[in-house]
Regions:
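Beta-sheet entry/capping signal
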Residues: 2-4, 29-31, 94
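Conserved residues at the C-terminal ends of beta-strands
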Residues: 6, 35, 108
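Conserved donor NDP-sugar-binding/catalytic core segment of glycosyltransferases
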Residues: 11, 15-66
Length: 123
């Protein structure tokens, strides 16, 4: 079994889940996040990310989440663009994970009161 977490403001497009489940089936210790596209809140214009614009989660020394470009060493490590990208952290409310692996990691800490903490929790 797998678990998928989505923040309440997330909208999914057709076919978004299958690639995530495929990666978990190949390696149950992989935590997968979909590419996050943007829908403009004024015009509803859909902006999709191509491979060159992809970023990974990172954090500053003040432990605040930030998006960072995929490092060149990580781009070179990958054999093809669809291969998982290693990331120091991730968006905490938008991912899929093997249920047993999530439990092994300790699940979410019930003491966290706000969503901001989840971005760094599994890093």
């Amino acid at each position: 079994p797998t678990l998928t977490f989505l923040d309440s403001h997330v909208e999914c497009c057709p076919g978004w889940l299958e690639p995530l489940l495929d990666r978990i089936a190949r390696d149950p210790t992989t935590v997968v996040c979909p590419v996050i596209d943007v829908i403009d809140d004024g015009s509803f214009y859909f902006s999709w990310q191509n491979e060159n614009g992809l970023q990974v989660g990172g954090f500053k020394w003040a432990l605040t989440f930030t998006w960072i470009p995929i490092p060149e060493r990580e781009r070179k490590r990958k054999k093809f663009p669809g291969e998982p990208t290693r990331s120091p952290t991730m968006a905490g409310g938008l991912f899929s994970i093997d249920k047993a692996f999530f439990e092994k990691l300790g699940m979410y800490d019930p003491g966290f009161d706000i969503w901001v903490s989840y971005k760094l929790y599994f890093s």
